[in-house]
Swiss-Prot record:
Belongs to the UPF0316 family. PANTHER family: UPF0316 PROTEIN YEBE. This is UPF0316 protein BC_3353. The chain crosses the membrane at residues 6-26, 32-52, 58-78. Coiled coil: none annotated. It comes from Bacillus cereus (strain ATCC 14579 / DSM 31 / CCUG 7414 / JCM 2152 / NBRC 15305 / NCIMB 9373 / NCTC 2599 / NRRL B-3711). It is a multi-pass membrane protein.
Length: 182
């Protein structure tokens, strides 16, 4: 019984670590992923080793499987809270909606406006880049000002140039100045 509990706890720890390592790889953060992978591998070997010691012990196998499933739930929760990386939203509007563009820019989001031809009239598309940790804030602004907007989104693996890159460099310089002033 104690072994089954240990296996369950190890799986609850192992699977979220596996989730984080996978996310880091997808986000092109391979060094961090390798470091996390060391811990992941150690936990995996210990947990599976206990199960393989006695394959007739069904409680250990059940603990492994249930722990894995519970670990997936926990890993998904942690991933949503960490919100690593950036996301792009494409927002389609019937009119230019300068109020929305101004509010998004004022809030620090990178926004590019495109004019295009719809089936019946001119349409406008906003390309908005944001940190995933600010996605909720972004959606609240859009829904408040343009509740009928059509939106689609995708995660960004990497980017170069543009407003966000300049803003990040500026924040990094300000942080260094603050550290040296202290």
């Amino acid at each position: 019984m104690l072994q089954a509990l240990l296996i369950f706890v190890l799986q609850i720890i192992y699977v979220p670590i596996l989730t984080i390592r996978t996310i880091l790889l997808v986000k092109n953060q391979t060094r961090s992923a390798a470091g996390v992978g060391l811990l992941e591998g150690a936990i995996y070997i210990v947990s599976l080793g206990i199960v393989f010691q006695d394959l007739s012990n069904w409680m250990n196998i059940v603990a492994y499987v249930i722990g894995f499933s519970a670990g997936l739930l926990l890993g998904g929760y942690i991933e949503n809270k960490l919100a690593i990386g950036y996301i792009t939203y494409q927002v389609s509007l019937l009119d230019r909606c300068n109020e929305l563009v101004d509010e998004l820019r004022h809030s620090g989001f990178g926004v590019t406006v495109f004019e295009g031809e719809g089936i019946n009239s001119i349409r406008y598309r906003l390309d908005i880049v944001a940190k995933r940790s600010r996605e909720k804030e972004l959606l609240e602004i859009i829904n408040e000002i343009a509740p009928k907007a059509f939106m689609s989104s995708y995660e960004i693996r990497s980017f170069k140039g543009g407003y966000l890159t300049k803003a990040m460099k500026k924040r990094a310089l300000m942080k260094k100045k603050d550290e040296h002033a202290s």
